[in-house]
Regions:
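Membrane-helix boundary/interface segments in integral membrane proteins
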Residues: 99-111
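Histidine/lysine/aspartate-rich catalytic loop segments that bind and position anionic ligands
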Residues: 96
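Alpha-helical transmembrane segments and their membrane-interface boundaries
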Residues: 1-87, 109, 113-178
């Protein structure tokens, strides 16, 4: 459980740090995140065992939506702080937010959720990341940029869940039918 949670929590940020050539990795420099992950895993295991509680996939989408927003905002801000061009900062925000979950699903032998259900996920991160970039261009305070970006990505994801939004699915051979 700790390994899978660690991949989900740190995978996207680690890839971002590799791509930005940032050392040490954020979770090495700030080991408190490792301790927090371990503590949360212990609490989750105790809670699940004591209560015989099995959270549904739908229930787990809410904290995931919040994480998507927070990781998008911070990942984009880190790339901006590294003086990356706007489009690179946006992509780094998306990588930070999405790649950990992709790693988690692959390790669990599942098709990554970000790719399988056609609900907006990465595109929510894309929109939130642009909020950070635009706020920076407008000289908005950093805290406001992060809050607005996290709120945008989270809200879009929550709306996608609640309203069952889907993106068009590519169908092999669809062009041949035309």
């Amino acid at each position: 459980m700790v390994v899978v949670a660690g991949l989900a929590a740190f995978g996207g940020g680690t890839l971002r740090d590799i791509l930005l050539d940032r050392r040490p990795f954020f979770w090495v420099e700030h080991a408190v995140w490792l301790w927090l992950l371990l503590a949360l895993c212990i609490v989750a295991m105790l809670f699940l065992r004591a209560r015989h509680f099995a959270p549904t996939e739908r229930a787990m989408q809410w904290p995931d939506a919040l994480g998507l927003g927070l990781f998008t905002a911070t990942g984009t801000q880190i790339a901006i702080g590294a003086e990356m061009p706007a489009i690179v900062a946006v992509l780094m925000g998306m990588v930070t937010a999405v790649f950990g979950g992709v790693l988690r699903d692959i390790v669990c032998n599942e098709i990554p959720r970000a790719f399988r259900d056609h609900q907006p996920y990465a595109i929510c991160a894309f929109a939130g990341a642009w909020v950070v970039v635009v706020a920076k261009a407008l000289d908005a305070p950093q805290w406001l940029a992060l809050l607005a970006a996290a709120g945008t990505a989270t809200l879009l994801r929550v709306l996608a869940i609640q309203l069952s939004w889907t993106l068009p699915a590519w169908r092999p051979g669809a062009q041949e039918e035309m």
